[in-house]
C-alpha cells in the first residue's frame, strides 16, 4: 500500500445522486426481483433488502442526498474503495455483492476489489497526476469492465454495477 497516493474524496455526478440505496431511498431499501436465465423464469420473485448496495437517483426525484464519501487506498494494482459515510457501513470496502452490483462488504482479504480511475481517454489517473481537486473519472474494475448504471426487472432502483464500456458513467471525484 502506498499511503502517499491514498486519499479521501467524494464521488458524485452532475444530475444524479450516488450513494448507498439506504441513503438515497431510506432504510430498508426493499426490492422484489424475478430472475431469468436464458429467457426462462427461474423461480418465484423474492424480496431482498438492498440497503447496502450502491445506486443512483436523479436529483429531481425526492430529497437531496449527501455525496458518497470514500477513502481510496492505493495499491500497486489500483485502488481499494472504502466507504467513509458515517453509519453502519463506515470503513467497509466496496465490492461485488449481488449479480454484478456493487455494495458495502464486510472486510476480508479475499473480498477486496480493485478499481482504476480513468479519464475520458481511458488513461489511468492517480492522486499524483490530478491537476485539480475535482476530476471527471470513470471506474474500471480489475476485470477491465466499467462501473455504470444497471436496472433490474422488478426493482425500483438503479444500481451501480460492473458493465461494458458503452454503459460506463462519468463521476466527479472531489479530493477532500
What do the predicted segments below correspond to?
Residues 1-176:
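Lectin-like carbohydrate-binding module/patch detector with strong preference for beta-trefoil
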Amino acid at each position: 500500500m502506498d499511503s502517499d497516493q491514498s486519499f479521501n474524496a467524494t464521488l458524485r455526478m452532475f444530475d444524479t445522486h450516488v450513494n448507498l440505496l439506504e441513503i438515497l431511498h431510506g432504510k430498508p431499501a426493499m426490492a422484489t426481483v424475478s430472475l431469468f436465465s436464458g429467457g426462462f423464469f427461474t423461480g418465484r420473485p423474492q424480496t431482498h433488502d438492498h440497503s447496502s448496495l450502491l445506486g443512483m437517483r436523479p436529483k429531481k426525484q425526492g430529497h437531496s442526498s449527501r455525496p458518497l464519501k470514500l477513502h481510496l487506498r492505493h495499491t500497486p494494482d489500483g485502488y481499494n474503495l472504502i466507504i467513509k459515510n458515517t453509519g453502519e457501513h463506515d470503513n467497509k470496502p466496496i465490492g461485488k455483492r449481488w449479480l454484478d452490483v456493487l455494495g458495502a462488504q464486510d472486510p476480508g482479504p479475499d473480498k477486496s476489489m480493485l478499481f482504476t480511475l480513468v479519464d475520458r481517454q481511458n488513461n489511468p489517473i492517480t492522486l499524483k497526476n490530478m491537476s485539480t481537486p475535482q476530476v471527471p473519472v470513470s471506474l474500471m474494475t480489475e476485470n477491465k469492465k466499467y462501473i455504470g448504471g444497471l436496472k433490474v426487472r422488478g426493482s425500483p432502483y438503479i444500481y451501480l454495477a460492473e458493465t461494458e464500456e458503452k454503459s460506463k458513467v462519468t463521476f466527479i471525484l472531489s479530493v477532500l
